Amino acid sequence: MSGFRRLFVVAAAVMSPALCAAARPDIENGKATFNTMCGVCHSVQKEGGPHEGPNLIGVVGRKAGSQPDFSKYSAALKASGITWSTKALNKFLVSPWERVPGTFMPMQIPDDKTRADVVAFLATLKE
C-alpha cells in the first residue's frame, strides 16, 4: 500500500466516528430549541400549554391538520395530504409557507442541524 493510500485509510478510520457523531441529531438540543422557538405556540405536555398551534405529542405518524382538540388549522394544511414523518417534518420546517402555501405556521428552521435536532426531539414524543 502506498504511503498516501495508507495515510488516507488511517485518516478515514480516525475521522469516521467523529463525522458520524456530528451527523447524529442532538435530542437535548432539539428540546431546548423547541422550548425557545416552538413552545410559544405548541405544547408537548398531556394537558395545558399554549394553544396557538396544535399539541405535538405523537405528531410523528399523525395526518396534518388532524389533532382532534385543535380547531385553528388552515384549510391548506388540512388539505395538504401530509402525514408527519420525520422526513415530512424536516421538509416542512425548512419553509412552511413554501411547502404548504396558506399555512398559518409562521416559524421556519433553516439550519439543517438545528432542524434535525428539533425533529429528533419531536420523534421522541409518544402519546
Predicted regions and their residues:
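Hydrophobic h-region of N-terminal signal peptides that target proteins for export
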Residues: 12-21
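Bacterial N-terminal signal peptides that target proteins for export
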Residues: 1-11
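Short Fe-S-cluster ligation motifs
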Residues: 68-83, 87
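Sequence/structural segment immediately N-terminal to covalent heme-attachment motifs in c-type
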Residues: 24-48, 56
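Short microdomains enriched in Cys/His and/or Lys/Arg
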Residues: 60-70
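C-terminal capping alpha-helices of c-type cytochrome domains
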Residues: 83-127
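Stable alpha-helical elements in mature extracytoplasmic
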Residues: 26, 33, 37, 52, ...
